[in-house]
Structures are given as structure tokens and as C-alpha cells.
């Protein structure tokens, strides 16, 4: 005859066995950056996607017309990014505190619509949240990251620079040849594509003096337009406002002396009507455009 005490013991034994037999919860995949974070129309670029729990290989996709990707992301053989002490532990217990680099390619059609696209990676344990990738129309370059003090890198305008602020206290310096009286635009696209970078831009003139600076314009993204006071080499310095930096601190910096829109007046129009639209910015028509 079963006693209440026997029943309780049997129930506890079953519960304990089920707890031991239950599998550990799966770790859902995630992504924290793509580098470079964009590409020019009509080009194919190799990209690095930083992610957690994507393992050796995983499928991924970029949504929208005019853009295709490699079928899979594959774990990079060399994981060059790490800050802090390593704590040895069995692989089964080691978490992924730092994103691991996954390699892939992106191809953009020459007539692809400009603007944002969203990409996702997934595996049997889930799907990562969508993140942004930018299709641009200007020539692009990708920063060649090196250790040590920043080395000024010369660029030819117009250009969109794909860079990254890493490690902490990193300062990137880009230089170009300016002409007295010419107008130049420098725009950072980082926070708007999901980067934690809170950028600060500083323009240094040929005489070593500061010409212009900016921190927040489009949210945490910097923007400035200035007129060159003299002929010569100008330096564009970019860094995090608090001198932070890590793998996800990617940015796109556009420097141009060509047409660049800042805003319109009025800000909107009514459907079914014609409106004289004033374009405000650099090297834009002075007369209104009818839309």
C-alpha cells in the first residue's frame, strides 16, 4: 500500500529526472554590425557581419530590389578583435561576449534604388533582427584598419568612406585637397544605421587651425558644411564624443564638393497639386523646382 510519503518521494524523483533530462535553452542568433555598412551602385563588396551564435556557417539574406548576397555567411578564420582578459573554460560553458566575424559578399545592381536595405541571418535556433545596409551613388572606400597612432589617409572627392572607431580612443583622419572659396559637405551616417557611435567631426585647415566642428546634427550623427578659407590640404578628424570604440562602432562618412541637399521648403505638398519647391543645400538650383 502506497503511503503519502512514498507518493511524495516518487513525485520528487520524477521531477528531478525531468529537470536533468530537459535540454538547455538554445541561444538565439544575433548580429551587431556589418562592415562596410554600404556599397555603391554597380559594385560587389566583401562584408564582415559581426554576430553571436551564428556558428561555422549560416544562411542570410538582404531584402529589397537590386541587391543580392552570398548564400551563406562563413566564420572568419582569423578573429582579430578582442579586448580584456581571456578566461579559459570548456567550450560547452563559454559564452559569446564578443561578436564573431562572419564573411559574405553583397552585389548591388547599377540601377538599384538608393537608400536602406535590411539584412537578416538565421539558423535552426532562430533568426536575428534585421539591420540596415546602405546603397549609395558616390565612389566608396573601406578603411584599412591598423594598430597604433592614426595615420592620415588621403581621399579624392566625392567619396563615401566606410570606417570603424576601434579600439577605444581611436581617431580616424582623412585628408583632401581643398580650394579657397569652395564649399564642402561632411556627413556621418552611423546612428541612423544602428551604430552606437556618437560622432564628432573636426576640420583642420592647411595652417593647422580649426575650420569647423560638429557633434550632433541628425541625432548623434555629425554634419557640417564649410567654405575653404585657403588652398591646401584639409584634415577631417572623426572620433566618438566620449572616446569610446568597439567592433560595432562603424560609420559612413561622405565628403563632397558637389550637389548636396539639406532640406526643402515647404516640407510637404498636397496630393494632386503642383508646388514650387525650394531646394536648400550645396550647389543646388537657386530657382524653385515645380513638383
Model-derived regions, located:
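N-terminal secretory signal peptides that target proteins for export/translocation
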Residues: 1-7
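Bacterial N-terminal signal peptides
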Residues: 9-21
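Sec/Tat signal peptide C-region and signal peptidase I cleavage site
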Residues: 22-26
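Acidic, Ser/Thr/Pro-rich low-complexity intrinsically disordered segments
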Residues: 27-86, 124, 135-137, 164-291
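Ligand-binding face of N-terminal immunoglobulin V-set domains in extracellular IgSF glycoproteins
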Residues: 41-51, 64, 81-130
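Predominantly extracellular/luminal regions of secreted and cell-surface proteins
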Residues: 131-157
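Histidine-acidic residue clusters that define the catalytic metal-binding segment
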Residues: 161
Amino acid at each position: 500500500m502506497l503511503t503519502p510519503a512514498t507518493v511524495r518521494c516518487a513525485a520528487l524523483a520524477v521531477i528531478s529526472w525531468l529537470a536533468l533530462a530537459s535540454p538547455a535553452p538554445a541561444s538565439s542568433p544575433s548580429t551587431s554590425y556589418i562592415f562596410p555598412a554600404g556599397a555603391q551602385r554597380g559594385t560587389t563588396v566583401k562584408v564582415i557581419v559581426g554576430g553571436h551564435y551564428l556558428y561555422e556557417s549560416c544562411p542570410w539574406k538582404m531584402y529589397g530590389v537590386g541587391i543580392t548576397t552570398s548564400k551563406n555567411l562563413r566564420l572568419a578564420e582569423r578573429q582579430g578583435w578582442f579586448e580584456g582578459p581571456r578566461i579559459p573554460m570548456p567550450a560547452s560553458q563559454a559564452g559569446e561576449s564578443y561578436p564573431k566575424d562572419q564573411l559574405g559578399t553583397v552585389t548591388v545592381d547599377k540601377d538599384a534604388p538608393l537608400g536602406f536595405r535590411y539584412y537578416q541571418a538565421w539558423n535552426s535556433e532562430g533568426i536575428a533582427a534585421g539591420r540596415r545596409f546602405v546603397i549609395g551613388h558616390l565612389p566608396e572606400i573601406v578603411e584599412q584598419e591598423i594598430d597604433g597612432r592614426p595615420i592620415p589617409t588621403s581621399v579624392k572627392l566625392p567619396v563615401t568612406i566606410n570606417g570603424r572607431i576601434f579600439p577605444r580612443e581611436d581617431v580616424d583622419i582623412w585628408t583632401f585637397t581643398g580650394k579657397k572659396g569652395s564649399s564642402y559637405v561632411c556627413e556621418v551616417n552611423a546612428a541612423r544605421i544602428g551604430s552606437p557611435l556618437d560622432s564628432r567631426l573636426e576640420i583642420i585647415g592647411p595652417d593647422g587651425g580649426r575650420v569647423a566642428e560638429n557633434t550632433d546634427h541628425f541625432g548623434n550623427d555629425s554634419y557640417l558644411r564649410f567654405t575653404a578659407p585657403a588652398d591646401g590640404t584639409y584634415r577631417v578628424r572623426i572620433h566618438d564624443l566620449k572616446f569610446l570604440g568597439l567592433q560595432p562602432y562603424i560609420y559612413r562618412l561622405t565628403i563632397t564638393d558637389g550637389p548636396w541637399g539639406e532640406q526643402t521648403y515647404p516640407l510637404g505638398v498636397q496630393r494632386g497639386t503642383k508646388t514650387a519647391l525650394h531646394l536648400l543645400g550645396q550647389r543646388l538650383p537657386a530657382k524653385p523646382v515645380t513638383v
